[in-house]
């Protein structure tokens, strides 16, 4: 279903001049939310979110790709944005990231450091003691910008 939603939503977002960053369906407090994250070079305003939300909402009503009720949310990925894709990871090489692991690696499940390399197998960061630390991608649960630019 996510692929179908991307197929519907991405062209609308891009035609309005925004970057389609990510989409997710989440369940919180018994309610479902379709979250669409958009971006642009100078940041996203509330007006930008409203504009995209109106355009997407009309199209989703017409196509009706989700078989249950949900709330549509359009927002910026934020300063502490999650890096979901290979493109996101490569774009933010040189920035500080926070990494949460699925299981412990060297007695920790949380790491922070400057992202210096991304490849098929590993993410490489420089940690606080200036050593390079290689983290297997298969162990990563979530990777976000830390806000320290």
From Swiss-Prot:
Gene: rimP
Superkingdom of this protein's organism: Bacteria
Database matches in HAMAP family: RimP (MF_01077)
Organism: Clostridium acetobutylicum (strain ATCC 824 / DSM 792 / JCM 1419 / IAM 19013 / LMG 5710 / NBRC 13948 / NRRL B-527 / VKM B-1787 / 2291 / W)
Record-linked NCBIfam families: PRK00092.3-1 (NF000934)
Pfam families from the UniProt entry: DUF150_C, RimP_N
Keywords assigned by UniProt, alphabetized: Cytoplasm, Ribosome biogenesis
GO BP terms: ribosomal small subunit assembly; translation
Disulfide cross-links: none
Protein name: Ribosome maturation factor RimP
């Amino acid at each position: 279903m996510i692929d179908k939603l991307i197929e519907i939503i991405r062209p609308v977002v891009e035609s309005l001049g925004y970057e389609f960053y990510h989409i997710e369906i989440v369940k919180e407090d018994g309610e479902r939310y379709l979250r669409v994250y958009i971006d642009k070079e100078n940041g996203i305003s509330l007006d930008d979110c409203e504009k995209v939300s109106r355009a997407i909402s009309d199209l989703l009503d017409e196509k009706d790709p989700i078989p249950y009720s949900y709330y549509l949310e359009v927002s910026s990925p934020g300063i502490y944005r999650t890096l979901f894709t290979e493109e996101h990871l490569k774009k933010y090489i040189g920035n500080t990231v926070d990494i949460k692991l699925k299981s412990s690696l060297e007695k920790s499940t949380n790491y922070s450091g400057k992202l210096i390399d991304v490849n098929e197998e590993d993410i490489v960061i420089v940690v606080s003691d200036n050593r390079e630390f290689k983290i297997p991608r298969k162990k990563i649960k979530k990777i976000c910008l830390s806000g320290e630019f």
